[in-house]
Amino acid sequence: MSGDVVAELKGRIDKSLEGLRTDLTRVRTGRASIAILEGVRVDYYGTPTPLSGVASVNAPEPRLITIKPWEKSVLKDIEKALREANLGINPMNDGEMIRLPFPPLTEERRKDIAKQVKTKGEEFKVTIRNLRRDANEVLKTQLKDKKITEDDHKRITEVVQKQTDAGITQVDEIVKKKEKEVMEV
């Protein structure tokens, strides 16, 4: 019964870490990354459609993304969606495809982005600590209901703490790696 608490905690921490990684792929660095466009939806015949569903998206150069729609009639809608997405990048439409040139980030902008990354990491640390609190509450309830012994409670609480520490360490590593990527010129 109590092993389930640890397994569930580990699963939820892993999901949180995956969520952090996903969120950070959308953070703009000095390089062109097609992941930044994942949240962009294009009005395709009245239906909000992911950009990848209406066009081919490529990063042929480190500071350029090209978007070639499968239907030329969608070009204006794609351009509109990109402008509304507030990516901080000005789309250039040449009638055939859209180019997204990524200008080099200024030192000040890189520091702002690094600060956002750090804030996002702190949010995920709080999430992991809340998961620990939930697991500990389940264990207390099990102890109170005599489903586990005092010794089991103490032992499992230590395992829960180790899982939490490991999760927070991973958050720190992910954030540090992303900050380094952002600060690279």
Curated annotation (Swiss-Prot):
InterPro entries: Ribosome_recyc_fac, Ribosome_recyc_fac_dom, RRF_sf. It holds the Pfam family RRF. The lineage of its organism: Bacteria, Pseudomonadati, Myxococcota, Myxococcia, Myxococcales. The keyword Ribonucleoprotein does not apply. GO terms for molecular function: ribosomal large subunit binding. This is Ribosome-recycling factor. Belongs to the RRF family. It comes from Myxococcus xanthus (strain DK1622). One of its GO terms (cellular component) is cytosol. Keywords: Cytoplasm, Protein biosynthesis. It comes from the Bacteria. HAMAP family: RRF. It is found in: Cytoplasm. The gene is frr. One of its GO terms (biological process) is cytoplasmic translational termination. Responsible for the release of ribosomes from messenger RNA at the termination of protein biosynthesis. May increase the efficiency of translation by recycling ribosomes from one round of translation to another. Transmembrane segments: none annotated.
